[in-house]
Amino acid sequence: MVILMSDSKLAKSHYWTKNYSSRNGQKIDKIIIHHMAGNLTGKQCYNVWKSREASAHYAIDSKGNITQLVHESYRAWSVANRYWDSRSVTIECANITGSPTWRVSDATMKSLIKLVADIAKRNNIKIRYTGGTGGTLLKHKWFMSTACPGPYLDKKFDYIAKEANKILDKKTDTTTKKPSSFKVKVTADGLNIRKGPGTSYKVVGCITDKGVYTITQTKGDWGKLKSGEGWICLDYTKKL
């Protein structure tokens, strides 16, 4: 598995589809959001695209897990329009209900907002939802005869843009806090332990037991394990 510098580190699994093409030098300046019209995982999307000429760069399941399927440096086959696909990074979101609302879970929404902010930051995109293609956050239905991304997501685009911009506008906390130690319970099936407080640091281990751990220091959303093994992201824990 090869992860490129241009790809999101938020993706914890990767299934590389063969359904992609060159961007032909086109700069990325748009993000297109889709819904899956089903409650699928990233791997299930990958399997569907084995027999369909379609793809997206990322898929988010109903638990909020992000899977990458196409490198951002390539054009995914997302809206059957070379011009728009060449300019876009595309995201598929799982549904927890069917027609007519096609809702997505809170976990999916949270991951979607983080991913949109991450894509925008790395590609120097200013997140703007204008209700049309002049903005940078776009809907699938604007390019094809489809209801995608469904009524629920359709009404959330302004919210997604605002919340993603809050992440980008948040000042980086450069001060390491040293509070009294506290305990957390891991809520993720697999939580990476990193050498330092951030995804740019090397993975040195993984917690898979959903156990209780003591945190001795915090920095932003990261906590240092009492064992000294490293740091974990506190977004995937519950404070006790």
Language-model segments: residues:
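N-terminal catalytic cores of peptidoglycan-degrading enzymes
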Residues: M1-D85
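SH3/SH3-like beta-barrel fold
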Residues: K210, G223-S227
